[in-house]
Amino acid sequence: MDALQYYPWLYIGLASLFGLLVGSFLNVVIYRLPKIMELEWRQECAESFPEYNITPPTETLTLSTPRSSCPSCHTPIRVRDNIPVFSWLALRGKCHHCQTKISARYPFVEALSAFLCGLVAWKFGYAPITVALIGFTLVLIAATFIDLDTMLLPDQLTLPLTWTGIALALLEISPVSLQDSVFGAMAGYLCLWSVYHLFRLLTGKEGMGYGDFKLLAALGAWLGWQYLPMIILLSSVVGLIFGLIQLRLQKQGIEMAFPFGPYLAIAGWVALMWGDSLMSWYLNYLIGA
């Protein structure tokens, strides 16, 4: 373990390798967790409303079973075809059996996980909190892509993330105090909850989902309430830019719904990495102005 402390490049390399390997599992989480949730909802509906004769699901699906397979020909993926990034490149982005194209997003998620984990290790160095922040980063990646795909932010991700942030503050592993962590979680939830109900009162429409409240609560628990204004501002700016671009490219009306969770996740991660620098720059800009 001393080698990791004295050779930072080794620590960064191992963190990147860990991110690469876990990134492969994140692809499974991103694809399967919404389907698992749907199966659970169907089962609950069938049990709660027997008068509607809802057929309960017969399929069994977990994050580990059954084995991953090609969505087109359903051939199980071989072990040598499951190496992050490299297998996709070796197969030229196609299934080895039916030659159906495999989405480039799979290696992208793996490479992104490796890159961001390496950045976290580089930024925070060899410390217990770094391991936690790597986990924090990986959960944000999974939540981002699930929200992009389904407009859902699963409680299975946001709630454990919130309680982990508070637990780290309680154990004094996190630099955030317990008081700031708890208040950050409460303020994060109530902030978007208030915006949601105000928007609904004024327009009669729902502007965001409850998953967004819980994700901001998790970010507040990890970073403290002081960073919430920055996260909200950054996520709003990024969301506005990408929303306008998407509206222009897809030529859809302003009524089109956009997931807000990815922008919260991006803003939260940026605040984690460079929040102090951004805050200093902003204050210096105000003083200089």
From Swiss-Prot:
Top-level taxon: Bacteria
Gene Ontology BP, a term: signal peptide processing
The cofactor note from the UniProt entry for this protein is: Zinc is required for the N-terminal methylation of the mature pilin, but not for signal peptide cleavage.
Major localization listed first in the record, in broad terms = membrane
Per UniProt, subcellular location reads as: Cell inner membrane
Bilayer disposition of the protein: Multi-pass membrane protein
Q: Does this entry carry the keyword DNA damage? A: no
Locate the transmembrane regions by residue number.
10-30, 102-122, 126-146, 182-202, 227-247, 254-274
EC numbers listed for it are 3.4.23.43, 2.1.1.-
- For this UniProt entry, what's an example GO CC term? plasma membrane
What phenotype is described for loss of this gene?
Deletion mutants are unable to secrete several extracellular degradative enzymes including the cytolysin/hemolysin tthat remains in the periplasmic space. It results also in significant decreases in host cell cytotoxicity, adherence and virulence in a mouse mode.
| Residues where Zn(2+) binds | C70, C73, C95, C98
Per its UniProt record, the required cofactor names are: Zn(2+)
Q: Sum up the protein's function in the record's words.
A: Plays an essential role in type IV pili and type II pseudopili formation by proteolytically removing the leader sequence from substrate proteins and subsequently monomethylating the alpha-amino group of the newly exposed N-terminal phenylalanine.
> What protein is this chain from?
Prepilin leader peptidase/N-methyltransferase
Q: Which gene underlies this protein?
A: vvpD
